UniProtKB/Swiss-Prot annotation:
Family: Belongs to the class-II aminoacyl-tRNA synthetase family. Type-1 seryl-tRNA synthetase subfamily.
Subunit structure: Homodimer. The tRNA molecule binds across the dimer.
One CC-aspect GO term: cytoplasm
GO molecular function term, any single one: serine-tRNA ligase activity
Protein's recorded name: Serine--tRNA ligase
Gene3D superfamilies: Bira Bifunctional Protein, Domain 2, Serine-tRNA synthetase, tRNA binding domain
Free-text function comment from the UniProt entry: Catalyzes the attachment of serine to tRNA(Ser). Is also able to aminoacylate tRNA(Sec) with serine, to form the misacylated tRNA L-seryl-tRNA(Sec), which will be further converted into selenocysteinyl-tRNA(Sec).
Broadest EC class assigned to this enzyme: ligase
């Protein structure tokens, strides 16, 4: 959530920043007008309540002195009616201000490409050599089905489209990938967490998924209370400290978790209908950081490095891009995507998004720490995929495919595959 005080102090700056995220200036004008009226009503209410308290004291004295206080009592009834009307207006104003404020995205950082067009995202650099083949490279879904390690057809029978069965060596490869990821993150100082896979509405609000993206999630009811299947481990990890004060000496705090992610993919009809790229359920290893505001840009670089390190050790070519302002996530001030090379598609595909959310989530979730002066401040939160497991499997199948239809296993994963160096049809 944005700092309303900052919008109040720098309205034109706020309009310019949010225009790069498709927010109209009229929305900010409406917010500020409501905020101004709210502050006026608050002052009027406080003045009337102070007057009521003073006169109530006078009435008590008059009654003790057996003086007639009818006029004062009548006047206080009128004051009470005015206070009740103002309280009602104030509640309505609070609701309207909150409605607008919680739907405004984060301010984009100064070095982000300011554009409403995702094509204006900026490539920063590339790593690795794209593999060359003396045959036409196959798509990962064709490879997986021919090797008998991925079964989309039976998954569709059981659950519908955008689901998959991993089988045999495919299941072992998926497990090898996420165990490798978790081990590497642990070496880098992340604390491994196994969080709840269902979260309440307050948690979804805290990380910014609700109220804007309710259509993109799956929700169940438990004893009349809604619970949402997590779209990412970011939600339970960030909310670990919701309504809490983090010990400043512990900052930065680094969490990592392997969880399934559940997404309805509303609005994705016709996109990536085959393969592992866009699923309703997929495994993902997430990285989350909590830090002091002055450290968050350095921590973003650390986050990117930790994601890159995995791709480099797997020998998978990729590039890093800075997303255009309107392509970044709702909560993010800056997002760097890592996109891995997919030979059969002849293009890069996202495998990690690393975002600095500044104090946006912390303000919604009320996550704070005490500074050197003992004053409460909001932490900054960061999150990144480290990495999306299914997409990693897909990229391994495509980049390491062999002419005979087998797939070589990246060297770093061989120990996780009990020494197996390739997946063949016999596996």
């Amino acid at each position: 959530m944005l700092d309303l005080k900052l919008i109040r102090q720098k309205p034109e700056w706020a309009k310019e920043k949010l225009a790069a995220r498709a927010i109209k200036g009229e929305e900010i004008d409406e917010l500020l007008a409501l905020d101004t009226r709210r502050r006026q009503v608050t002052v009027q209410t406080e003045e009337l309540k102070a007057k009521r308290n003073d006169v109530s004291g006078q009435i008590a004295v008059m009654k003790r002195n057996k003086e007639n206080a009818d006029d004062q009592i009548k006047a206080m009834r009128e004051v009470g009616q005015k206070i009740a009307a103002l309280d009602k207006e104030l509640a309505q104003l609070n609701e309207k201000v909150t409605y607008i404020l919680v739907r405004l995205p984060n301010f984009p950082a100064d070095d982000v490409p300011m554009s409403l067009n995702e094509d204006d995202s900026r490539e920063e650099y590339k790593w690795g050599n794209m593999p060359t083949f003396d045959f036409e490279p196959k798509h990962h879904w064709d490879i997986g089905e021919k090797l008998g390690i991925l079964d989309f057809e039976r998954a569709a029978k059981v659950a519908g489209s955008r689901f998959v069965y991993y089988k045999g060596a495919g299941a072992r490869l998926e497990r090898a990938v996420y165990n490798f990821f978790l081990d590497e993150h642990q070496k880098e100082g992340y604390e491994e967490i196994i969080p709840p896979y269902l979260v309440n509405n307050d948690s979804m609000f805290g990380t910014g998924q609700f109220p804007k993206f309710t259509d993109a999630t799956y929700t169940i009811t438990n004893d009349g209370e809604p619970l949402t299947l997590i779209p990412t481990a970011e939600v339970p990890l960030v909310n670990y400290y919701r309504n809490d004060i983090v010990d400043a000496e512990k900052l930065p705090v680094n969490f990592t978790a392997l969880t399934p992610a559940f997404r309805s993919e509303a609005g994705s009809a016709g996109r990536d209908t085959r393969g592992l790229i866009r699923m309703h359920q997929f495994n993902k290893v997430e990285m989350v950081k909590f830090c002091k505001p002055e450290d968050s840009w350095k921590q973003l670089q650390n986050l990117i490095h930790d994601a890159e390190d995995l791709l480099q050790k797997l020998g998978l070519p990729y590039h890093v891009i800075t997303l255009a302002s309107n392509d970044a996530s709702f909560t993010s001030a800056k997002t760097n995507d890592l996109e891995v090379w997919m030979p059969a598609q002849d293009r890069y595909r996202e495998i990690s998004s690393c975002s600095n959310c500044t104090d946006f989530q912390a303000r919604r979730a009320q996550i704070r720490y005490r500074d050197d002066d003992g004053k409460l401040q909001f932490v900054h939160t960061l999150n990144g995929s480290g990495l999306a497991v299914g997409r990693t499997v897909a990229s391994i199948l495509e980049n390491y495919q062999q002419a005979d239809g087998s797939v070589k296993i990246p060297d770093v994963l061989v120990p996780y595959m009990q020494g197996q160096t390739a997946i063949t049809k016999e596996d």
